[in-house]
């Protein structure tokens, strides 16, 4: 079953909250999102202030990693509370409590 954009955004935020700063390919594999969709999603999350790009220079290479912001963590908390309050799926929450 295909994920909605909201579910994809939440999955990306969860990955960054759980693993810290990650390169694009690491986010791609851990969130199970293809590269072009991930780039669009990260652009949106960056515009919303939920994710930030961090740049590092290593000799000749410039490395970019992505990290969740404090605002992104707050959004994850609100989403978890909403999921619990509404019991939308009748399943256990998809967002592990250890992130909060």
Regions found by a protein language model. Give the residues of each.
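Amphipathic alpha-helical dimerization/coiled-coil segments
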Residues: 74-100
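Short amphipathic alpha-helical interaction segments
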Residues: 2, 33-47, 53
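Short acidic, hydrophobic short linear motifs in intrinsically disordered regions
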Residues: 21-30
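Basic, amphipathic "hinge/linker" alpha-helix immediately C-terminal to the N-terminal HTH DNA-binding motif
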Residues: 58-78
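Short alpha-helical segments that sit at the start of domains
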Residues: 1-11
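Short amphipathic alpha-helical elements of helix-turn-helix/winged-helix folds
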Residues: 11, 15-19
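Short Lys/Arg-enriched helix C-cap and helix-to-coil transition segments
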Residues: 52-58
